[in-house]
Curated annotation (Swiss-Prot):
GO terms for biological process: 1-deoxy-D-xylulose 5-phosphate biosynthetic process; isopentenyl diphosphate biosynthetic process, methylerythritol 4-phosphate pathway; terpenoid biosynthetic process; thiamine biosynthetic process. One of its GO terms (molecular function) is thiamine pyrophosphate binding. The gene is dxs. PROSITE patterns: TRANSKETOLASE_2. Belongs to the transketolase family. DXPS subfamily. Keywords: Isoprene biosynthesis, Magnesium, Metal-binding, Thiamine biosynthesis, Thiamine pyrophosphate, Transferase. The keyword Transferase applies. It holds the Pfam family Transket_pyr. GO terms for cellular component: cytosol. SUPFAM superfamilies: Thiamin diphosphate-binding fold (THDP-binding) (SSF52518), TK C-terminal domain-like (SSF52922). It catalyses: D-glyceraldehyde 3-phosphate + pyruvate + H(+) = 1-deoxy-D-xylulose 5-phosphate + CO2. Gene3D superfamilies: 3.40.50.920, 3.40.50.970. This is 1-deoxy-D-xylulose-5-phosphate synthase. It comes from Bacteroides thetaiotaomicron (strain ATCC 29148 / DSM 2079 / JCM 5827 / CCUG 10774 / NCTC 10582 / VPI-5482 / E50).
Amino acid sequence: MKNEPIYNLLNSINSPDDLRRLEVDQLPEVCDELRQDIIKELSCNPGHFAASLGTVELTVALHYVYNTPYDRIVWDVGHQAYGHKILTGRREAFSTNRKLGGIRPFPSPEESEYDTFTCGHASNSISAALGMAVAAAKKGDDQRHVIAIIGDGSMSGGLAFEGLNNSSTTPNNLLIILNDNDMAIDRSVGGMKQYLFNLTTSNRYNQLRFKASRLLFKLGILNDERRKALIRFGNSLKSMAAQQQNIFEGMNIRYFGPIDGHDIKNLSRVLRDIKDLKGPKILHLHTIKGKGFAPAEKHATEWHAPGKFDPVTGERFVANTEGMPPLFQDVFGNTLVELAEANPRIVGVTPAMPSGCSMNILMSKMPKRAFDVGIAEGHAVTFSGGMAKDGLQPFCNIYSSFMQRAYDNIIHDVAIQNLPVVLCLDRAGLVGEDGPTHHGAFDMAYLRPIPNLTIASPMNEHELRRLMYTAQLPDKGPFVLRYPRGRGVLVDWKCPLEEIPVGKGRKLKDGKDIAVISIGPIGNKARSAIARAESESGRSIAHYDLRFLKPLDEELLHEVGRTFRHIVTIEDGTIQGGMGSAVLEFMADHEYTPTVKRIGIPDKFVQHGTVAELYQLCGMDEDSLTKELLKQCELLPDMSKIKELTN
């Protein structure tokens, strides 16, 4: 590769112990080399790019000042932790990041003792870190420090506020680092964003900040005891002057900052100075997402996970998609605009994922009818419920794995009142390289028991458009649409917007030996597998697209129960409690006794890899489905022998 970086210091760092042997004056060079290593690796092995560039100095400072892994670092989300992985002994394996069998996309305790808590979703770091701090205190370990790292985007989550509220009542060694870069994946939104901006820019606070900076400079010549005494005195002055305008100080959490999160020497010095102060503390850092790579600094959203690129020029290697089917996300976004143009009651809601779910299409064309509520899934659902209660028709788009966080809101604030909220579950099924925290495996199983819900999963883009149209018609109540990440199957995806009768599936193909019942896009793999199995076995296999998990198409299922002795169900959700379970229950309730083989995501947390690899791993790819259908064909009676016996 051109301009291959030279790592004079990074090559000698295999653990934080090696880092701590360096002089503080060497840390800027370590940061430069670490940043270049991240750029080099991710240019050819794609992952979460911009966030990790923004936390290089913070990562180095934490492992330099604190005695990790004895001291605990808890990352929020984990998008920003690649530097942490490299410094903690995983540099040689980093090229396997997010690959099947390779290191994991987010910090994981199963992978390293330096990864103290599983992450992937937002806003949980403060609560987890507080729990660790309390555990240390209960065990009499008053030397252990626990540090939570949370971004300003995650601070909009209710769980973060719950953790802050509880932290304020404990005397434990907890440090909360607020990594303020004005970004989640997209721009941060809401009152907390504005509050942090005001906290930084107010004249009154800047005066205090300037005085504190002068004081810290002078403290450099003092011994440790005097330094700590003066810091306590300075914090008392700051508290008296700023407590009324500082939400953290008002919650009895000592506030330090804001400081430049890219000044490694000063950051290390501040961490040392506040390290041994007892009680909960928060250090506010200003960082730049994408720091050190100009294209990422300028366009942080596009460079959140950019794919492959040239590490020198920044040119992104974008695949040629001409002639390919569209993304399900873009079909959703464009269809929503089409519906909103005809139905003035329609509004869109997303919790901090406007670009990921294509809600940004509605935002750009009808900005007053689209709402990014920040990382706040429960609020997004209840907010939608409130709008629906007074006559609007919300389309609330939340990734399937994140909708888990809003379960009570769905029941209490939408379903009980039978409110017409359309819950759009993006990223349903296996999502690939982000792994178990992000797979949309459980939605059918956890939503199926809730009364009043309609639950549908389209097989293709035409079905998605028609179901979206159906969902916004009068008197449909709460309506769930689940669809996968990635491309559909139809190049010509536009079709007339027509109503689909609620609870009605469809027969895709006649057959007489085996009935295959599928739901959602995996039905396309099932269709191909059926054709192959019929060709190899000579048997006749029927195919039904159930389309609706709730209400079930009872007429269709009665037909299947009366006609077939062998049924195969195929779904892209967990096998426990999903569509296959619903079919089994129906057959038992109506005293049909077929053999039912269920195919779906197994009862385990599926790790990371490409979507194709994971479908193969779970026995849900076309080849595996074909083999299973052939196995079922072998269980059928030999018709030639039956004919001989009857003659």
